[in-house]
Amino acid sequence: MKGGNADSWQREKLASMESPEEPGASMDENYFVNYTFKDRSHSGRVAQGIMKLCLEEELFADVTISVEGREFQLHRLVLSAQSCFFRSMFTSNLKEAHNRVIVLQDVSESVFQLLVDYIYHGTVKLRAEELQEIYEVSDMYQLTSLFEECSRFLARTVQVGNCLQVMWLADRHSDPELYTAAKHCAKTHLAQLQNTEEFLHLPHRLLTDIISDGVPCSQNPTEAIEAWINFNKEEREAFAESLRTSLKEIGENVHIYLIGKESSRTHSLAVSLHCAEDDSISVSGQNSLCHQITAACKHGGDLYVVGGSIPRRMWKCNNATVDWEWCAPLPRDRLQHTLVSVPGKDAIYSLGGKTLQDTLSNAVIYYRVGDNVWTETTQLEVAVSGAAGANLNGIIYLLGGEENDLDFFTKPSRLIQCFDTETDKCHVKPYVLPFAGRMHAAVHKDLVFIVAEGDSLVCYNPLLDSFTRLCLPEAWSSAPSLWKIASCNGSIYVFRDRYKKGDANTYKLDPATSAVTVTRGIKVLLTNLQFVLA
């Protein structure tokens, strides 16, 4: 091909490449001519590059923050992007917007260093001795995520020695969740607090809030009120009548429902146990329910149980009248499924389980208590049976149980599945439990306590994706058997069935200190227990 013919061929080829795509043209042909490239790691790489230039190479600093004599070479753009406080400072007509050096008075040098670490890296090591100051300063500088994490940390670690101080702190910063946690600790340990400096200087408003929320009678709230008044009788005598009127005393009974099959009969029982002030347990009553229980949970003041001669049938035990009544049955027969109460939606969820043909199920259905109706929703990621279930802020954590292996034989599961009741979506956590198989779980604040066969008791923090194995007395692991767990009145109760009629162990765990005490006077006429629910 020569001369004009060659030039003509080149022009035709270029024209065909530049012309719009003809109808029916192959996508494969156009792919090699023109396509859009999107670098998915671009934004992260840019952010890392900026932080490296700013911190490691100390380039482009345009503001100096002086704290207790130490100067921090920082960047207005980075500070403004993370903190509304600094954004307002640098964009206002105040002198700080134009000054090269800014002096901060309300924060210590060590805590400000932690704030800088958080602003630039998104990571900060929270230490108990500095936690309250970080909490206050992060609120002042409007670092919302850090403030909320400090609040959760304080709520988990609140104890007798700091509960009143934390309560003051939460009140000043309008933090209702932390305030409630601190107030609960204060009212349940009032007898220990009544002669402390923090209690004697407590404002009248906060004292009223504590005693009106229901103080256990064993804490002698009347004596605490008298001690507070007598500390400054001249000024506080006028509050005496209003405080006594506001006082609400409550008993300390913990209701734990044990559902299981009594060895000498063919029916199952529901027994309400009462843990009294001295931690002795007595049985209050029992109601018969035919055949084997398949699942159970407590919703509001009532106990819901699935089972009987027809496995899909559900019963409700009214806690006030101690009467059983039928509810709407499940759409299909299911065994070894998990019932979880979700009070925020006034619903009870049934997750996983087995069919009567012994096939694992990934079905999720929920029961609308007010309407007495079951509704099907999206499925679990992995079919499981016999898993533990715990509701935490509308997210159901389905833990362990049994799943299918590659050959469709069942095996003990270590999976953590999260079902969001707001979006009806399920996902599996990228990490697994420290043990596998059947287990039971209870929620305390934003933690999930998990108990399994043998000596395994673990505290799971879903926010930090962490597990903490708790140390317990030697008696705990003396004979492996299945434990049950319940959360009530700020404590964790763990029940162990020894499979001997009339003989059982119950432990009471203080989540704040991890201290374990053994309850006394236990005589339970049940074996092969299905659930323990508080």
UniProtKB/Swiss-Prot annotation:
Cite the entry's keywords alphabetically: Kelch repeat, Repeat
* Superkingdom as given in the UniProt entry: Eukaryota
- Describe where the Kelch repeats fall, as residue ranges on this chain: 255-301, 302-344, 347-394, 396-446, 448-497
Q: Which Gene3D superfamilies match?
A: 1.25.40.420, Kelch-type beta propeller, Potassium Channel Kv1.1, Chain A
Q: Where is the signal peptide?
A: none
- One Pfam family, please name it: Kelch_2
Which residue ranges does the record annotate as region Disordered?
A: 1-25
| Keyword Nucleotidyltransferase attached | no
Q: Where is the BTB domain?
A: 61-128
Q: Write down the InterPro entries for this protein, in alphabetical order.
A: BACK (IPR011705), BTB-kelch_protein (IPR017096), BTB/POZ_dom (IPR000210), KBTBD4 (IPR042884), KBTBD4_BACK (IPR042950), KBTBD4_BTB_POZ (IPR042949), Kelch-typ_b-propeller (IPR015915), Kelch_2 (IPR011498)
Q: Domain (BACK): give its ranges.
A: 163-255
Q: What role does it play?
A: Substrate-specific adapter of a BCR (BTB-CUL3-RBX1) E3 ubiquitin ligase complex which targets CoREST corepressor complex components RCOR1, KDM1A/LSD1 and HDAC2 for proteasomal degradation. RCOR1 is likely to be the primary target while degradation of KDM1A and HDAC2 is likely due to their association with RCOR1. Also targets RCOR3, MIER2 and MIER3 for proteasomal degradation as well as associated proteins ZNF217 and RREB1. Degradation is dependent on the presence of an ELM2 domain in the target proteins.
> Quaternary arrangement and interactors, per the entry?
Component of the BCR(KBTBD4) E3 ubiquitin ligase complex, at least composed of CUL3, KBTBD4 and RBX1.
Q: What else is known?
A: As part of a BCR (BTB-CUL3-RBX1) E3 ubiquitin ligase complex, mediates the effects of the small molecule UM171 in enhancing hematopoietic stem and progenitor cell expansion ex vivo by specifically targeting the CoREST repressor complex for proteasomal degradation.
This protein's name: Kelch repeat and BTB domain-containing protein 4
Species of provenance: Homo sapiens (Human)
Q: Which gene encodes it?
A: KBTBD4
